[in-house]
Amino acid sequence: MTSGAVPSCRRVTLALLCLVAGRATAQVDPSGSWRTLQTAHFRIHFRPTTRAAAEHEAREAERAYGLLSRELHAPRGVVDLVLGDDIDAANGFATMFPSNRLTVFAAPPTTDPGLEHFDDWLRLVTTHELTHVFHLDRTKGWWRVVQSVFGRVPGTFPNAYQPSWVAEGLATYYESRLTGGGRVTGSFHTQVLLADAAAGHRRTPWNAVFFTRWPDGYAPYAYGSRFFERLSEAAGDSAIPRFIERTSGQLIPYRVGRQVRRASGRDLQTEWRAGPARAAARSIVPAGNVLAARLWTEPVPRVSPDGRRVAYLWDDGKSAPELRVADAATWRPLRRHRVNRGVRYDWLGDTLIVAQLDFTTRWRIRSDLYRWLPDGAWRRSTRDARLVEPRAGGGRLIVPRLVPGGNRLDLAGLDTAGVIWGEVVPSPNAQWIAATRHHAGHWSLVRWPAAAPESLAVLVDDGGTVSDPAWDGEALLFVADWTGLPQIHRWAHGSPLQRVTAAPFGARTPAALPDGSLLYTTFTAGGWELWRAAPAATIPPPLPEAAPFDSAPPVPVHETGYRAWPSLKPHFWLPLFFDQAGAGRFAGAFTYGSDALGRYAYALDVAVAPSPLRAQGGFALVSHALGNPSLDLSAARQWSLVFVTGAGIVVSEREDHAALGATLEARRWRSFARIRLAAEYRGDGYVADPAQPLASVCVGCVTRDEVGGSATLNLGHLVSAPLAIAPDHGTLLTAVARRREQQGSPRWTNELLGRLLWYARAPGVGGFAHSVLALRAAAGGRAGPGAETFGVGGVSSGVFSLGLGPTLGGSRFFPVRGYAGSSVNGRRAATVSLEYRVPLALVGQALGHLPVGADRFSAALFADAGDAWEPGERARLHRLRSAGAELVADVTVSYDVPLRLRVGVAEPLASPPGGAARRPQGYVALAADF
């Protein structure tokens, strides 16, 4: 048998295994001890170390459930809620498949401008994610009929087909309506919408989805939530539940505008245009200088104690973010260093103290401190310390430490009960400490003598968000959004409060320079900008009062150990039918799922043929119960027809496969190492029907049982960015060693495979991303009496999942474009491909009102070469060789699902084996092959 292409899984079970395993690894560390708090509507899973936060979460979850159920239909069944504390970043996510479940990360968003407007972090994130469950679980009409028969089948939830601004807009609308915070009433989304409107970049309802172009992931949240806010103002609060009910039963689930009109009597486009149009008139150009522009992350400025240098974050979306240092007077760049995400920093003397995220285990992402010394040396100071927001002054460094559900300061005498700290900043003379403090549902600005933390005084304690404290001599600069936009204010002892900026789209993160000017960041339609301007002091308007805050009431809870089965059990099934001609007509079912923690993931299918009576199917299980390594077990059987003799005797083949493996993985932010060791079984058997000796009807039908093992090594280091068309730096290495021995026979097979992928930034004509040079080299060999041959040639495609197992595309280990698959065969093979990739256009536009869109386009010029040969023969790697070009289109289907299409033409540079004519070959492929 020749193996030209890397085959896709032949069993539905194995095709699903990667999906369920991937979902499991995307959550929390499922190993170790977990407990469960059972409430009326939730199973809340937590580690014993997060018990206090879990009890808080139980109260907030039931509060959110009660408020949402007053307006929306309650979801079916008990909701599994996982309280994770493995990532030092604020986030959460929800899913309605295989059952209703959500995950909340306990770390609070202390300085994230998009999330800092909250009265209680767990309240806000739980309300947001639970709204997704209420919304997406709702089904009516024929969708409910299908689910009543087959269960919670993927693809039968109509509200999941709508554009992302609907789901995220609804969740953001309710997070703001049902809590004392939220992004609708915060200022960050106002900045997003004002900047887009002023630049004429307002998104339509079909473009406010997850396109790559700026503002990227902010758009669905900002546009969607403000639309639903306006709709509720125009048609009443009840219009929102009516809209959800309408979309939950519509036959064509992509429609939005019709259901808006039927639910509210309002026109989608008219209401959509109303909000941003009001903002356009506010566009003015402030006085000052732009120092950095079109950045994807806020370039927070930090001025060195001597006032001569400025550190800021440079993230243009084209390559990895960098921490840069520039001369404060001339803005001449002095040095730079690549950083990860979650980056915050400050000067301690002439050294930069940097906090950033990185993997500390396979599952855990922690914020640790690094020191960037004046000589350019970069040294890690802590590991697994959970230290965030370093601020320094007068030679003193203060860094809050994250704890489950909050953070703490290691300062004796400071009252920290019920407090979440923002930035804590020592004064330049080290006599005072200023901080932003979240307490009793809102932020305030506080100050205390460095030697007497118990003498804390509240300087500003009003409504809105207070953030970004910075010293200006003995005065304090800070940011407040009392006017609806964030602006910089100045507090000085004995003087009235002043507002010192009036930036049209807001100003954040102030830093004072020795000449009296200010550095600050602002938001535009092209991204973040860093400005330098003179302060313009004005008296701010009367300050709003802080809203009252009430804790969620106690709820009855029952604590148990974690039990996987309630969420692990099958939640759906689908029928299977296979017609294998004379080998049997099979009917059966399949299912798959995972538990709430992602500790186990499985897939199962079984089918039976009545005549002749046979069964086929498969089972696959992945276990992350140990954390590292992961274990996997799979087994499958399949029947197929070989031939039918002239006498009507049917010869069928039975293929059996089984494997038991263990995978060990180590990870860093841009690097990983993974090794899998597996024991494997493969069996082939033949059956004649009616039964008789096989040798009399099929000479080559020999039963084989092969037992062996394999080792697979993957090593990688990749540097990429949101706009990148490919990694612009890095290497991926895959190596496979396998041995199989046929039982009862001296036949054996050894196999070695290796593939190297290499990427480097290349000179180009510019554009929205960097040009990239990419290399792929692959080689393999097989030896032994049972060795099969490799096939070289053909186009290798990525794989696009259609859901429920089926996929489009398929990869080849030894492709050479311009030739047919397996044009040459042998037990030795090697290929090499070189590509030059260039960006063409960043589009980010829907195709009319259809749920498809064009995200971006790029192109590639390539050259391929390869050969296959037998041991003892001379390799001719130019035997197959070609050159050509590809147009690469990144598109979206179903509004937000990304799909990459490659349309290419390859010119063979050598005559195909067998004497076929040499002519250009066109092709269409899916996804990226490398």
Kindly give the residue locations of the regions a language model identified.
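Juxtacatalytic substrate-recognition/specificity segment
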Residues: Q27-F157, P163, A171, F210
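Blade-terminus and WD-like Trp-Asp/Gly-His loop motifs, strongest in beta-propeller folds
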Residues: P301-R309, R344-L352, P390-R396, V424-W432, ...
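Acidic/His/Gly-enriched intrinsically disordered linker/tail segments
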Residues: V28-P30, S99, W121, V125, ...
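C-terminal outer-membrane beta-barrel translocator/porin domains of Gram-negative envelope proteins
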Residues: P556-A564, L631-V650, A659-T663, V687-A865, ...
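Beta/coil-rich, acidic/histidine-enriched accessory regions frequently appended to metallopeptidases
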Residues: Q27-Q38, P215-A219, E233, R242-I353, ...
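A flexible loop/linker signature enriched in serine peptidases of the S9 family
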Residues: R183-V184, L295-W296, W314-L323, H337-G342, ...
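Extracellular/periplasmic ectodomains of large secreted or surface enzymes and adhesion receptors
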Residues: R262, L268-G307, L313-W314, H337, ...
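Outer-membrane beta-barrel initiation region
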Residues: W296, T522, G527-E529, A534-L633, ...
